[in-house]
From Swiss-Prot:
The gene is msrAB. It catalyses: L-methionyl-[protein] + [thioredoxin]-disulfide + H2O = L-methionyl-(S)-S-oxide-[protein] + [thioredoxin]-dithiol; [thioredoxin]-disulfide + L-methionine + H2O = L-methionine (S)-S-oxide + [thioredoxin]-dithiol; L-methionyl-[protein] + [thioredoxin]-disulfide + H2O = L-methionyl-(R)-S-oxide-[protein] + [thioredoxin]-dithiol. It comes from Streptococcus pyogenes serotype M1. This is Peptide methionine sulfoxide reductase MsrA/MsrB. The keyword Methyltransferase does not apply. Has an important function as a repair enzyme for proteins that have been inactivated by oxidation. Catalyzes the reversible oxidation-reduction of methionine sulfoxide in proteins to methionine.
Amino acid sequence: MIYLAGGCFWGVEEYFSQVDGVLDAVSGYANGRGDTTNYQLIHQTGHAETVEVAYDANRISLKELLLHFFRIIDPTSLNKQGNDRGSQYRTGIYYTDKADLAIIDEVFKEKAKDYKKKIVVEKAPLKHFIKAEDYHQDYLKKNPNGYCHIDINQATYPVIDESKYPKPSATEIKEKLSADEYRVTQKNETEKAFSNRYWDSFDAGIYVDVVTGEPLFSSKDKFESGCGWPSFSRPISPDVVRYKEDKSFNMTRTEVRSRSGNSHLGHVFTDGPKDQGGLRYCINSLSITFIPKADMEAKGYGYLLSSVE
């Protein structure tokens, strides 16, 4: 069991109820003054809107849950998430098992690198948890158009642990990559269209960063765009890519880079299939390596098989 405060509990509860491996998500109030409060009193009693998350550790780890949690909050915002303001909307991770603190600290340390501002998420033992009123439970299931400050759909995307795919040193990168791979990933060059290794390949599997091995795209989201480069409707997870404005060649485009390796991957455009979200990730074959579905388990990517099937 872990207790997560991430702003309005309606969205947090609904998000975690959709995460594979979560057994139950319950809205409530935690770590205020005293063990009695309600929705009308929490701004006076100092409790935080919190979700009790029960999970099967054989299906999802605490670290994976916390990576999901950081996906849906702004950890640098004090007493504010989305449009909600007040101490009851502060972020926090409250634990009942002291052994969990080491994992929480590990995630904090890793996530601190992603932000210029200080992380202000509370981490503390759970003092008390008071279940919220019945009308708050499963609120968004009962009120599908109700207020929610987070993107619930992201719950279905896999969490990919960046620490498993560290970036090699500059010397190691140069030794590992071919001259062409180096020019594309490190010097932002573009390979030739229609003569690269993956533009017309549609076998089942995943595509990973050629530098770090971090998973980036799934064959399930690959489509024939006619542009001569591999095209995808979305990344395998929203967490694994970064975006940058690119004004080279007298154009304004959105560059796509890998998260861990900071490799130049390509660009994203808005002329993709409408029924798949309307985006086209135009990616250099030299920036990625294909892992066939049959090899994913042996190469450590078995946890992503459901993203291919």
